[in-house]
UniProtKB/Swiss-Prot annotation:
The keyword Membrane does not apply. It catalyses: N(tele)-phospho-L-histidyl/L-threonyl-[pyruvate, phosphate dikinase] + ADP = N(tele)-phospho-L-histidyl/O-phospho-L-threonyl-[pyruvate, phosphate dikinase] + AMP + H(+); N(tele)-phospho-L-histidyl/O-phospho-L-threonyl-[pyruvate, phosphate dikinase] + phosphate + H(+) = N(tele)-phospho-L-histidyl/L-threonyl-[pyruvate, phosphate dikinase] + diphosphate. It comes from the Bacteria. Belongs to the pyruvate, phosphate/water dikinase regulatory protein family. PDRP subfamily. ADP binds at residues 165-172. Bifunctional serine/threonine kinase and phosphorylase involved in the regulation of the pyruvate, phosphate dikinase (PPDK) by catalyzing its phosphorylation/dephosphorylation. It holds the Pfam family Kinase-PPPase. PANTHER family: PYRUVATE, PHOSPHATE DIKINASE REGULATORY PROTEIN 1, CHLOROPLASTIC. It comes from Lactobacillus delbrueckii subsp. bulgaricus (strain ATCC BAA-365 / Lb-18). GO terms for molecular function: ADP binding; ATP binding; phosphotransferase activity, phosphate group as acceptor; protein serine/threonine kinase activity. This is Putative pyruvate, phosphate dikinase regulatory protein. The lineage of its organism: Bacteria, Bacillati, Bacillota, Bacilli, Lactobacillales.
Amino acid sequence: MTENKAENKQTEKTEKMEVNIIIISDSAGETAFNNAQAAAVQFPDAEVNYRRYPFIVNEKKLAATLEEIEQYPNLVIVYSMLDEKLQLPIIKFAREHKARYIDILSPIIEAISQTTHMKPTGLVGANHQLTNKYFNRISAMEFAVMYDDGKDPRGFLEADVVLLGVSRTSKTPLSLLLANKGLKVANLPLVPQTHIPKEIYQIDPTKIIGLTTDPQVLNRIRRQRMISYGMDPDTAYSNMDSINAELDSAMALYKKLGCFVINVAERSIEETAALIMNHLSYEED
């Protein structure tokens, strides 16, 4: 009995530490996201979750964002905001919640300003040309945020692609990545004993992507999530029998729909996105 406990403790120690990188921007947030990604790849033993909040252009949107991210543990906030009034609440929140925070733009802007003796324009998104491609991306990002987690079933009928998957199969970050490439994406979490919206059965099956993973991988991720919240890792959420049942149920639905299935285990979201774009014969402009 003692040996089993020791083995369990050792397993928990080797599980990946969860880090939630929050990207807040008054524009599309590509600069902040790319910098965060470049830094995060230096930590392969961490489970890094990217949570993007683009187009936060007023105090009301920012307040809602800060309220939402309060639920996540181990926060690293990366922000790109030109309006100082929107920077201050982020800094205050980070300090109150003992979160690390990084201002991507201000130090560079200040350095250029001091060198040139010029004042910055303060124009949001000035580095983007106002092209159809740019506006399509903005529209797609807004669409992905609006129809994340099955918030409104009507989004399934308007989407270019619909992602289905059990909890922790990278639906949201994948949606945002595809949106950044111009695709309108909606996603639906497959929760046990929950009704599937009728709209799912009305969609062209070629537009539906069923996400699955390996049971052991999902077990590890879910256990670590419980540990990061200070909870018992051995719950129904992380139980292998429950996980197998969830994955089997999801696969049965995918078979019924006749949709394209991707196993995301040990696969980066960039690789998964490439497979989806290839399946859709979609070429980024």
